[in-house]
UniProtKB/Swiss-Prot annotation:
Name the UniProt record assigns to this protein: Pyridinium-3,5-bisthiocarboxylic acid mononucleotide nickel insertion protein
EC number(s) on file: 4.99.1.12
Catalyzed reaction equations: Ni(II)-pyridinium-3,5-bisthiocarboxylate mononucleotide = pyridinium-3,5-bisthiocarboxylate mononucleotide + Ni(2+)
One GO process term, biological-process aspect: protein maturation
NCBIfam families: nickel pincer cofactor biosynthesis protein LarC (TIGR00299)
InterPro entries to which the protein is assigned, alphabetical: Ni_insertion
Species this chain originates from: Moorella thermoacetica (strain ATCC 39073 / JCM 9320)
Entries under Pfam families matching the protein: Ni_insertion
Disulfide pairings: none
Protein keywords: Lyase, Nickel
Length: 396
């Protein structure tokens, strides 16, 4: 399994993330070509090699030319969904922007849908966020781990005047995640950086055991008494067994007084907050009323964010949670070519006690549905073609 460890000893921002990925071997041409699939005009990447305290690093800046419109969350999600980006990149990019908009909305006391991203800042954030996720995808990263995050201190100038560091939106994004104070009078973790790492990281902690393959540094723009760099380490975890045991939290609540039209939004927002799965179960309540048991599974570091989403988007007054163990397959995404077009598929591998390998294949439903509609073919035929092509892969 290919993993990426973000060592955020001096914080994280979108451009630092892009720089670290390029320093670790991400092709600038592949990155730029992929980002062109957004259909976004008036930008270019400036990449240069710099040194900070004698350490070589990659500096990335998004140059925006011409005027740009104000964009709300729906506009940005439309750009992402209508792009030619791979399905996993679309999904993760949308999740990051939803979390960023949710935090900005909390700061200003408005709904996430009302948050607008200012002209140049919107383009910069789009390229930073989508580019970072695309970069991880192109490098084949399957798991992201991050160090705890330094808060920084002082004040930062922004469109709304001087604000304390960390910026209010950053603090909302960092709820439920490990942070620590520093004496640096600078903004170390930006809202974009916070949205990226809290959405993408599977866990936070010390440097993991792995076979180290690449190390790269992404440069920050602020001059500090120490290297203002994001260190990215790439590596592989080799295990004698392919299955993995891990713990997750199970969060539950029973609801019998909510408009049923609100349940789909509750599910969507809970998943966007970091749940790995969520579902509804019909139950009979104590007074004989029909009700719904809402269950969500999430990593331990996502508890605060997922709980906040459930309280915000449901009528519940309390949650139960417990720690469960689960076995997970080694997973990866792949793209297979079918007579109808290219289809992304999810591959899972599990080794049973006798050593026999069990492989599960799941074509991405939404992609199959769109391809079937475009080709005028039955969905089941596109799905079957994707399964057949995936079985021919030597994916593991």
């Amino acid at each position: 399994m290919k993993i990426a460890y973000f060592d955020c000893f001096s914080g994280i921002s979108g451009d630092m993330c892009l720089g670290a990925l390029i320093a670790c071997g991400l092709s600038q041409d592949e990155l730029t070509s992929g980002l062109k699939g957004l259909g976004l005009e008036g930008w270019e990447l400036r990449v240069r090699e710099v040194k900070q305290h004698s350490i070589a690093a990659t500096d990335v800046a998004v140059q925006v030319t011409g005027s740009q419109p104000h964009r709300h969350l729906a506009d940005i999600l439309g750009l992402i969904n209508n792009s030619s980006l791979p399905a996993p990149v679309k999904e993760k990019s949308a999740a990051v922007f939803k979390n960023l908009a949710r935090a900005e909305g909390q700061v200003h006391g408005i709904d996430a849908s009302q948050v607008h991203f200012h002209e140049v800042g919107a383009v910069d954030a789009i390229i930073d966020i989508v580019g970072s996720i695309l970069g991880l995808h192109l490098l084949g990263i399957e798991k992201v781990i991050s160090s705890p995050l330094p808060a920084g201190s002082g004040w930062v100038d922004c469109r709304h005047g001087k604000l304390p560091v960390p910026a209010p939106a950053t603090l909302y994004l960092l709820q439920g995640y490990p942070v620590y104070g520093t004496e640096d009078k600078a903004e170390l973790v930006t809202p974009t950086g916070a949205a990226l790492i809290t959405t993408l990281a599977d866990s936070f902690g010390p440097f993991p055991a792995m076979n180290l393959t690449r190390v790269g540094f992404g440069a920050g723009k602020t001059e500090l008494p120490h290297p203002n760099l994001l260190r990215l380490a790439l590596g592989e975890i080799n295990s004698g067994q392919l299955e993995g045991e891990e713990s997750s939290l199970v969060i539950e609540t029973t609801i019998d007084d909510m408009n049923p039209e609100f349940f789909p939004a509750l599910l969507e927002e809970t998943m966007a907050a970091g749940a790995v799965d969520a579902f509804f179960t019909p139950v009979q309540m104590k007074k004989g009323r029909p009700g719904i048991l809402f269950t969500a599974l999430c990593p331990e570091n996502k508890l605060a964010a997922v709980a906040a989403a459930i309280f915000t988007h449901s009528s519940t007054l309390g949650l139960r949670f417990r720690r469960d163990q689960r076995l997970v397959c080694q997973r990866r995404m792949a793209e297979v070519v079918t007579p109808y077009g290219t289809v992304p598929v999810k591959l899972g591998l599990y080794r049973d006690p006798t050593g026999q390998v069990i492989t599960n294949i799941a074509p991405e439903y939404e992609s199959c549905r769109q391809i079937a509609k475009s080709a005028g073919a039955p969905l089941k035929e596109v799905y079957a073609a994707a399964l057949a092509a995936a079985r021919a892969l030597k994916a593991f």
